[in-house]
Amino acid sequence: MAMIDPLENNLFDLPDYENTEDETFPPLPPPTSPGRGDAEWAQANGDPDGNQQSETKDSSSAARKAVKRSIPKLDANRLVSERGLPALRHMFDNVKFKGKGHEAEDLKTLLRHMEHWAHRLFPKLQFDDFIDRVESLGNKKEVQTCLKRIRLDLPILHEDFTANEGGGGESNGLDMATEEVHSFSGNVGELDSLPGTTLTEEQQQRIKRNRQLALERRQAKMQCNSQSQHDELSPSYPEEELNIPVARDLTGALEDTQVTATNVAVTETEDRERELQCASEKQ
């Protein structure tokens, strides 16, 4: 095998650094010079794009200083929001449970709807963690107030207030019958007492009609209350027990009459004996 001569084919030829001229570079500005990064200084030194690096640095620093988005949290305000506890009031309106003998299926249906509600309210938590978090939030004042309003069927959201304004008169008509009667009578008295105020026939008829409706509602309510009280008393107190006081009163009256008659007869007998005794003494 032939050896290769390293001097052949100029394998180890080195460049002639002694006779090679160095590249010319623009001088660097001093560290404290105000011209560093200046566009005029860059153009004067043959670097028209010298300010691009500074612009990119400024943009990157501005991007780093951007305000971070707040991470949503499962707190009391979110729990009492529209998708929170108020949504549970109407969640099971269209759900039909199978009843006795199908308790396991009904429980699965209940849990499935509750998991759906929890996912819509706060998707980042698993259902078990969500339950623990809600349990810890149960002592908050906002949550307690929301639960009380739900139990008392009071309006919570804006839609509840608008719904009550639209249909509150019909639903609570019987409960407000007495107040309506007093309010109508008071309004009529005030209108009559005000000087210079005249009511048209239509207004008077409307007032009379409203008063009549209020009176009818009040009578219906009183009749329902009396009927319910009678129904409650009748099974617990049979008719025989209810008639016992009357029978006792009649018996007592008869006994008093008999005692009075006996006393009168005794008195008359004593008077006759005294008269006979006086007559015998005179003779």
UniProtKB/Swiss-Prot annotation:
Family indicated by similarity: Belongs to the CSM3 family.
Protein name per Swiss-Prot or TrEMBL: TIMELESS-interacting protein
Lineage start: Eukaryota, Metazoa, Chordata, Craniata, Vertebrata
Keywords, sorted A to Z: Cell cycle, Cell division, Cytoplasm, DNA damage, Mitosis, Nucleus
GN (gene name): TIPIN
Region named Disordered: 1-68, 186-205, 217-238
GO cellular component: chromatin; cytoplasm; nucleus; replication fork protection complex
The keyword Amino-acid biosynthesis is assigned to this record: no
Ranges annotated as biased composition (Acidic residues): 15-24
Originating species: Gallus gallus
Gene Ontology biological-process annotations: cell cycle phase transition; cell division; DNA replication checkpoint signaling; mitotic intra-S DNA damage checkpoint signaling; positive regulation of cell population proliferation; replication fork arrest; replication fork processing
GO molecular function: DNA binding
Keyword Transferase found: no
Region (Interaction with TIMELESS): 74-150
Places the protein is found: Cytoplasm; Nucleus
